[in-house]
Amino acid sequence: MANVLIVYGSTTGNTAWVAETVGRDIAEAGHSVEIRDAGQVEAEGLCEGRDLVLFGCSTWGDDEIELQDDFIHLYESLEATGAGKGRAACFGCGDSSYTYFCGAVDAIEERLSGLGADIVADSLKIDGDPRTMRDDVSAWAGRVVTAL
């Protein structure tokens, strides 16, 4: 049984829904899952004792990449603390009409890769309401479980 942490930042509830759905799918596969809001965690020690950390963040801003407010402190702290060096994968919700569709997901994954994280699955990028893409969310969770 693997120990998985899912950390997310969500303003409208869409990314939170994805975090909860992915967490439920991973737990149903027999793994231990903890889901935390990014505003309630610190980067220091984030990956310690975890087999995998999933990072979920919605993207805001049309002309530049803006991470969801609760996620900014964690994102900025990852490099300073050296956290984020374990196994990871990223997901998020956005709007494909924006210049940088799900740009926060790309920024987080790039930061983690730069810190030496092992990215175990391609990122999941949801356009709009994730509830209409339940099969895609579950398929991604399945790929994550396979990587465990």
Swiss-Prot record:
Q: What is the lineage of its organism?
A: Bacteria, Pseudomonadati, Thermodesulfobacteriota, Desulfovibrionia, Desulfovibrionales
Cofactor(s) listed: FMN
Q: Can the keyword Flavoprotein be found in this entry's annotation?
A: yes
Q: Coiled coil where?
A: none
User: Protein name, please?
Assistant: Flavodoxin
Q: Which organism is it from?
A: Nitratidesulfovibrio vulgaris (strain DSM 19637 / Miyazaki F) (Desulfovibrio vulgaris)
For this protein, the record's NCBIfam families field holds: flav_short
Top-rank taxon: Bacteria
Report the residue ranges that make up the Flavodoxin-like domain in this protein: 4-145
Q: Which GO terms describe its molecular function?
A: electron transfer activity; FMN binding
Pfam families on file = Flavodoxin_1
* Reported function: Low-potential electron donor to a number of redox enzymes.
Question: Family per UniProt?
Answer: Belongs to the flavodoxin family.
Q: Which UniProt keywords apply?
A: Electron transport, Flavoprotein, FMN, Transport
For the keyword Transmembrane helix, the answer is: no
